[in-house]
Amino acid sequence: MTTHVPRASYTEEELSKLYPKELELQLVQILLRHGERTPVSPRFQNTGLPPYWPYCNAARQLSSVIMSTTDFTQWDQLKYRRRMETFGADDSPVIASGPSNEFDAVCQPGELTDKGRQTTLALGQRLRHLYVDQLQFMPQLIADSDSIYLRATPIPRALESVQQAFWGFYPPSARTADFPPPTIITRNPAEETLFPNDASCRRFGQLSRAFAQRCAERWNDSEDMQYLSNLFSKYMPDQAKVAVDSRPRLSGVMDTINATDAHGPATKLPKHFYDPKARAIIDKIAVDEWFSGYKESAEYRMLGVGALLGDITSRMAGSVEGNGRDGLLEIGERPHSSSDGGRGRGGETGIKLALSGCHDTTLAAALSSLGAFEGENWPPFTSHIAFELFKSKSASASKTPSHPSTPPSPSLTQSTLPSSQSWWSSLFGRAASPTQSPSSSSNTTPSSIARKPLSSLSPSERATLDGYYVRIRYNDRIMQIPACKAAGKHLEGDKSFCTLEAFKAVVDKVTPKNWKQACNSRLDEPAFPEKIEVPGYE
């Protein structure tokens, strides 16, 4: 399946079961895959598939921020339209055109298309219907975005998708006239953990290549691959056989099939490419190549998605403490500061909603690392995961928020670890954030339990987690974490509600203390563990 087909809205009966009265929703974190896009590189032009697609009308109405005075006091916008230039027959420059000689609205490789904008906008509208209209979790009208965390990877389609989803969740009619610009968090690509970053994490690059090679050895000479070659070889360069590591790779073939399937008749491949059996084979092998590492190797999970899962869980823990400092940390504010850092900043009471624009590899990696991706297909465009944090109304009535009086100890580095500690324990388990440094003077001290592994919590800190539950929904389907099925690890009568303590214990096992250090460790060690390390358990 290329495009996610959403289910109908939950009925009142379904809502009463999904959101029981004894629980109160406290925090929602959404990971959303970008919407439909063009292929990341042109392929199969020998079939007549145009290299340039006319599905990006945003290119007709782009704008850039312009400094209009030399004293930095005035800023404006330059509106413009984009056209693509390419090589002509004799290498002279020509304007690229679509299949019907369109010059405007022509897409770049991997660009979010009009349909991708449409489906991510619709996702935001569906989320609004659930969390605003049906559950009254978020307000109908907002004056600022202080309780909302927006984040995206450096890839433009991810940023544009989260912008579209936010617009659907809170359209202009649901924002006050003086609504200030929302903050959207991004990272340097070398520090990006919102997708499995094999380009910047050397050890993860080694692991991913090793598992990809194993996949090639497993499938290249199989009957399934022969079936694909019988269909597609005549379109491959030099009529080569299709293989996991062919050129284009099998995952590249899938990329073009999925992108063409999601768009109009002018950009379609020959019908053989959409053969149902062939697509099922491609999906199965691609999932094996890209995601089997998460199901077999704790190190793979740690380097690929552990930092992200640690961020999600620490935000939950910060929300539980109830002091709002997790919100301040997310947008870079100082608590009790006289400066508000701009309109809509400085009065945070804690993040309630997080929207993160990411990728298919993010979603599958997160679910696989929690033991919740068994038997799943490749995530379609505009798929999403909702991590929902609940608190028991009976428990919350008997507890008050915890306000730690002493800061946590600094995180350990490799040089300060005792010599008897193994490399494994030195890399796992997120410690507290470092103390302030010249490069991060605006950092605030994290809340006491947000960045501490469960094993390091005191009895009183651990008790703070009591009465809180985590539930995961993937494309509106409830997903089950294996560790949460055990007695005492879930809400009585419903195994889909994992205790926050059990959820944190699972995530702690894959959360690196220092991701960059882990990425440059074990470079001479074998890629595969001695035995399969099953995910989703404490």
Where do the language-model regions lie?
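Signature for phosphate-centric chemistry
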Residues: M1-Y149, T153-A354, C358-E538
